[in-house]
Design a protein with these regions (language model features):
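Short, positively charged, Gly/Tyr-enriched micro-motifs
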Residues: 56-148
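Short, conserved DNA-binding cores of transcription-related domains
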Residues: 1-63, 67
Length: 148
């Protein structure tokens, strides 16, 4: 019974999270700074499916395009920490933790068994490796600043 309630609560939580995040689409104005000193123009709203600790959700976000840089800008993705990824920071942290503790395939199994979350072995591996690289870069920066 408790696992059935957990599953129902996770679905309810995912629905609530999706609705809360939908309140802000990321549309700031017709033009925004692209991050490289140019102006990116609003083009349209685009959908993105995110994998969260509450299951998958879909967001509708404002998409801007910078013709000078020939690249897209999605402010809401930056704000939510999901630019260039479909894993939310919460789920990424869980995948990092299991990926650092056990072999990646076992980590995938643990996420499914303990949290009801389905990720591929490769996604657990990529997540753990990405965080490992970020930690190594932070250590290198700290060492350079400390003069060692």
């Amino acid at each position: 019974m408790e696992l059935a309630i957990r599953t129902a609560m996770r679905k309810l939580g995912g629905s609530l999270l999706e609705r809360l995040l939908a309140l802000d689409t990321g549309h700031r104005s017709q033009r925004i700074d692209c991050g490289s000193g140019h102006l990116a123009e609003f083009v349209s709203y685009r959908t993105k499916t995110l994998d969260t600790v509450l299951g998958p959700i879909t967001l509708n976000r404002a998409y801007y395009h910078c013709s000078d840089c020939a690249s897209g800008v999605v402010p809401r993705d930056e704000e939510l920490g999901v630019a260039h990824t479909s894993l939310t920071p919460g789920l990424a942290a869980m995948a990092d933790r299991v990926g650092a503790a056990v072999p990646f395939s076992k980590g995938r199994d643990l996420l499914a068994e303990l949290a009801g979350l389905e990720l591929s072995t490769k996604r657990v591996e990529r997540c753990a490796e990405s965080d490992g690289k970020a930690i190594a870069a932070a250590i290198d920066t700290y060492a350079a600043c400390a003069g060692t």
